[in-house]
């Protein structure tokens, strides 16, 4: 099967959300939580003669309850499930659950047979070699895909903007990365990772709300906190000045209605939460600067002039102006700073994958089943770079 004859499947597995769809499309067909849930209450069958008991997968406490829930269904039933994220800080850590998510993606979300479509998977910039091989192996041996490609998330974000040179700050739910790219080539020695992203900001917002007297303790309630963060937070251009405004008047306060109808009010928490992206520790602006300074002198100008923001944790209003201000203060005065923040940047990685998979010039880069059978999983290091 020639890869250009059928649409490729593009899957961007994030720490929090799985985005999937077809190469050549403008947006993913589906975006669902990257979670797997199993019932907390499971049954036991007891043999009174042998005084023995054993776990029975099919004997659940609730009639009709399944053994496994994935994505939105798992999210809606969090109260009765043990929920796990198979991807931690961008890296797949639970392969059995990851297989379940991929199965769900193919058959329940996209309604396709994976053996009929080439599959492009995204990977974080510092993905371990063993993980790249495992992804390749599972796609060929479990899902029988005819071809596969594993693509760097940072490069895909850059491609989504139409650029081949620039530095990407990709900040999702689990991890933030800077990836400098020059004429399509990743400058690997300058990739930097920051274990500060959306989930950390949600936890911080929860702390701020607790200080204000609002308590959210269960996993389900923490999803409410995430919603508050996403709907009401913004990045202050000048944090100290914004704090003074917030203390002097209620102008910055906003109300938020909880699912039970209760209305809460928050003020400076709105900008104090995403301020964690910039301080008190090494911020995303300093990480971008440090990454650029690890590159050769003669390309730094190009990188400072094409700073691409990508991922859900770059969606806060005000982040572009603040990033411009911070990088201008850090960079040499001769450097012109340009921040590129497409409105659809929450899905930039997936969009870049969709563009790449649909290019006729890309087709020879797929790893075919024949190549895999001949070389094994290590073929991924030779063809996907």
Curated annotation (Swiss-Prot):
GO terms for cellular component: actin cytoskeleton; cytoplasm. One of its GO terms (biological process) is phagocytosis. The keyword Metal-binding does not apply. Its EC number is 3.6.4.-. It comes from the Eukaryota. PROSITE patterns: ACTINS_1, ACTINS_2, ACTINS_ACT_LIKE. Coiled coil: none annotated. InterPro entries: Actin, Actin/actin-like_CS, Actin_CS, ATPase_NBD. One of its GO terms (molecular function) is hydrolase activity. It holds the Pfam family Actin. It is found in: Cytoplasm, Cytoskeleton. It catalyses: ATP + H2O = ADP + phosphate + H(+). Keywords: ATP-binding, Cytoplasm, Cytoskeleton, Hydrolase, Nucleotide-binding. Belongs to the actin family. Actins are highly conserved proteins that are involved in various types of cell motility and are ubiquitously expressed in all eukaryotic cells. Multiple isoforms are involved in various cellular functions such as cytoskeleton structure, cell mobility, chromosome movement and muscle contraction. This is Putative actin-25. The lineage of its organism: Eukaryota, Amoebozoa, Evosea, Eumycetozoa, Dictyostelia.
């Amino acid at each position: 099967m020639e890869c250009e004859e059928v649409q490729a499947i593009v899957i961007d597995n994030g720490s929090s959300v799985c985005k999937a769809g077809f190469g050549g499309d403008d947006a993913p067909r589906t975006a669902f939580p990257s979670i797997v849930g199993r019932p907390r209450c499971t049954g036991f069958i007891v043999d009174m003669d042998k005084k023995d008991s054993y776990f029975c997968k099919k004997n659940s406490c609730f009639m009709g309850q399944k053994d496994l829930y994935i994505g939105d269904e798992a999210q809606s039933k969090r109260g009765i499930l043990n929920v796990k994220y198979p991807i931690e800080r961008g890296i797949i850590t639970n392969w059995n659950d990851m297989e379940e998510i991929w199965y769900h993606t193919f058959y329940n979300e996209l309604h396709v047979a994976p053996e009929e479509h080439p599959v492009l998977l995204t990977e974080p910039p510092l993905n371990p070699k063993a993980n790249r091989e495992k992804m390749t192996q599972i796609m060929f041996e479990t899902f029988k895909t005819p071809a596969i490609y594993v693509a760097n998330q940072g490069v895909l974000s850059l491609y989504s903007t139409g650029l081949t040179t620039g530095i990407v700050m990709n900040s999702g739910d689990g991890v933030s990365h800077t990836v400098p790219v020059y004429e399509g080539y990743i400058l690997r020695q300058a990739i930097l990772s920051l274990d500060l992203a959306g989930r950390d900001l949600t936890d911080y917002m929860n702390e701020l709300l607790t200080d204000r007297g609002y308590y959210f303790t269960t996993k389900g309630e923490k999803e409410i906190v995430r919603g508050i963060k996403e709907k009401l937070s913004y990045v202050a251009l000048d944090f100290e000045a914004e704090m003074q405004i917030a203390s002097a008047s209620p102008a910055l306060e906003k109300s938020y209605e909880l699912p039970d109808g209760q209305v809460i009010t928050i003020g400076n928490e709105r900008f104090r939460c995403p301020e964690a992206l910039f301080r008190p520790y090494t911020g995303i602006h300093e990480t971008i600067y440090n990454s650029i300074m690890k590159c050769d002198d003669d390309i730094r100008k190009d990188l400072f002039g094409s700073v691409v923001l990508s991922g859900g944790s770059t969606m806060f209003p005000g982040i572009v102006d603040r990033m411009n201000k911070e990088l201008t203060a850090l960079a040499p005065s001769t450097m012109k700073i340009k921040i590129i923040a497409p409105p659809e940047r929450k899905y930039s990685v997936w969009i870049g994958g969709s563009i790449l998979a649909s290019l006729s010039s890309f087709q020879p880069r797929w790893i075919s089943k024949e190549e895999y059978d001949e070389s094994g999983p290590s073929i991924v290091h030779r063809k996907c770079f």
